[in-house]
Amino acid sequence: MSIRLYILFFFVLSTLSGISQQLSGVVYDAEHSVALPFVSVYLVETDESTLTDSSGLFSLKAPELKSFHIRFVAMGYESTTLLCAGDSPVITARLIPKHLDLHEVTVSGALSQAQSENPFHIESRKIDDLTAVAAMNMGEAIARIPGVYQSSLGNGIAKPVVRGLQGMRVVTLMNGLRIESQQWGGDHGMGITDLGLGNVEVIKGPASLLYGADALAGVVYFNDQPHAPTGKREIESKTLFQSNTMGVTQRFMYREAREKVRWQLGAGYGNHADFQLPNGRFAQNSRFNEAVLKSVLSFNGKRSVHHLRYTFSHTTSGIPGHTHDSLATPESFQVETQRRSYTLPAQFFNNHFISFDNKWFGERSELQILAGATSNRLIEYDEKVTIPSLSMSLTNALYNAKFVARPLGDKWKIIAGLQGMHQWNLNAENASDRLVPDSRTFDQGAYLTTQYGNARWNVQAGVRYDVRLLRAFEESVESFNRTYQGVNASAGGVYHTEWATFRASYSSGYRAPHLTELLSNGFHHGALRYEIGDADLNPEYARQADVTVELTGEHLVLLYNPFVNAIRDYIYLQPLGYDVDGIPAFAYDVLSEVAFYGNDVGIHYHPHFAHDLHFETTWSYINTRTPTDSSVSLLPPQRLQTTLKYSFDRNRKFGLREVNVMHTFMDAQRKVAFMETPSESYNVLDAAMAFELTGKQRWEFRLGVKNILNERFIDHLSRLKNIAMPAPGRNFYLSVQFKM
């Protein structure tokens, strides 16, 4: 009932008089001083947009603010964000032709702050760029970002690994809503598809200050695609076929925007059979299917903007490599026939995400309040058709309140915030096993941060306090009650010139032990292990130093980003060396301290003699240091990713738009934990090309091949490594996308 009252309260506040301030401008090519038509113009604070006309002119209505950000995006030009005064009658923007760009330069979805002004290095990528070579899921797509890997269980389940850490240490947000989807399990996916998403931002390392406790590895922040331009409607449909799984993925989005109200509706479906191995056989029970629905409703007041978002997803996924037979061989999980219909063992996931995001603007201040809820239903079937082995419901009610003050104008900013989450975890009565008891968790956090910047320098510092109350119940009787608390701080600075950017930052993080680490005592069939918790575990504390040096020339960009992340009381799963009913037993243990260190290096070269040719390579290196033996498992090996892209003339009605060739070298991993096996190095070569047909409607055709050489390899982070199951073999794909 209280949630309904909050929503009604916010809705009443939003019914103020409409926006009255008119904003107009013109966009030019900076080199040739010619007007640019069809440039996308985004007003960042209100999420409104429009297009320039044939003369480069644009007009839209803006809120009555002292200042605001306007972002200009055009194909073939560098994205530009301008900070404009509220009384600016006419705005002139000059876009620089894009010769090279190591990473997408956007305004951070969390702070409405240009990344060039952010002391903390953020990797930002468009979803379209990450899927230039088709990806099976979002985990695979974002693993193409330096320092980010994926831990997968076949094709249907994948989650991000950031600088060697995963699971509960990675916080995922979608448009500011924290996503909780039982991410503690290695066999549980993200619950997020690419439907309606525009870009993703990754903060690597402890990021608890603004995003809450637990983010020791970092934050993965997904942003929706922008609304249609005011007065316009857009229809987008995409179909993707992949030969390796004989799989089809369908996406559909409808967008419409009026003066005060904008909305989006979307639906998607995917169905994939068992994936084919390089030897021509198939990975038994690696099939999966998914369905997703999405809606967005946005509306504006005189000095406010409001977004109501809802997403539903359902996934059915087989569990490959599952067995109780201790004498099973790798060949027993490879079959001659590819199948699509699900068989046991299998997992079923239902996810509901709903959020109501509100912003009110003052003369020199801004108030943002987000209220939301997430619901995750997980059902695992092992061998019994009618009785699930696990059946759990995870429900979260959360809020995020943030106040931004600019007492001395835009140079100085003070941010104060409150965050809270109430979580219920319940087991179904009909499940045969209970991995963890029923529980309730209450999180509360408060933070204060300040930022100061000028034309060259930007500095930021802040502090945060978190408290977590955790209660567990056995047969409705309280059996466990703990309170955890922690204080974190961060500070950083950035200095930028026309040719260089230097960043240095320090941040700390705090993570209370999760319910599964404390109280597990049962079979986790999806992960194929018997897990035993430790009720006396202490919280983890992390401290990271991070430096970024970025040098930019006319035809070359160099980036060097070393880091050290030291974690105290590191919690890990320790194999016990024996089985329980044919399933290996593991217990949660603690390491006094472990240091993760390494670097990301990037090079983007654009030769002067070939303006349409782009060569980009990134190298990611991660290692650990512990006071005793290495108890850190699943440490990502060194990785070298190289992309060669050639863009063709876009002035033709139909033609080849671009060609992409991508090569990945994954080094061998010899640094392993107790009872963990090493991994060999491998090379994977992918290629893709895109054709475009323009007119009243725009058609895009993409075709490509993944794993062109049909390389047989087993990724070190694969959850199927223990049964020697290789990754998918050669995969031809074709996608058709329609926009109008």
Regions found by a protein language model. Name each.
Residues P37-V39, F68, M168-V170, S365, ...:
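Short beta-strand/loop motifs in extracellular/secreted proteins, especially
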Residues L43, T172-M174:
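Conserved aromatic beta-strand anchor motif in extracellular beta-sandwich/beta-rich domains
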